Amino acid sequence: MTTKSSAPTKSIPPLVIRSAIVASLGGLLFGFDTAVISGAEEKLTKLYALSSMGEGMIVAIATIGTICGAIVAGKLADRFGRKPILFWIGILFGVGALATALAPVPTLVTAADGTVSASSAFPITFFMVFRFLGGVGVGLSSVVAPIYTAEIAPARVRGRLVGLVQFNIVFGILLAYASNAVIREIAHEDTAWRWMLGVMAVPAVFFLIFLATVPETPRWLLAHGHEERAVKISERLTSTQEESSEQIAEMKAQIAEDAAGGKVAFFTRRYRKVILMAFCIAMFN
């Protein structure tokens, strides 16, 4: 004879769902920005008279920005808050999209030997700078969006909601390829690349608008002495007063433990295998 638990299943508060969806839009922008350049790369190579190295750089420069963004993301989010950094992620994506879409195109000069080159380095430099800034947004998003979701979500649904960020990264890549295909069919050949790059400003604007409707995380607020605000937000993020109190207590204990424990020596024999596995999974992904 089997027995069923009499404990009622707790529903997920609407604010938790909304906050997780908004944060996951950062993942969507991440994926979109990573893939969208593929549709414009061939045209850019011709317009800017790029060498093989130059062609590689217009793709790689965003990855370099991603590395830089990821390195500083944790410290920035700890100092200024998760939500402000998410805001700047939206700004970087939006500005990067519009600037690359409106980037100037150089006059091409043909030398006596038939070699074609750009008359000025400014246009490609302009394009590279804003591709780099978009990459910084990708790096920040890869760190801050999952942190925000994990700190907003109750423990019982945390894994599922953090997974939403990863899902939207892949969905953003798919959306970029689909967007490129549609634009290639409906836009003029000479301007299609601008639309491909600029269209990302649309989800970036929606991300910024929706971001205004979600709160800072209670954990960050507690860590910075804003307990009253943290408690109020926690009550909106949980189903019961008891659950909220438990989460606040757990956060306080964790913050105190982190403060007392100092820095963890990750790069030691004890953690070597786990860290190596994490790096390999991320690299091959």
PLM features per residue range, with description:
Residues 1-285:
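Transmembrane-helix signature of 12-pass secondary carriers
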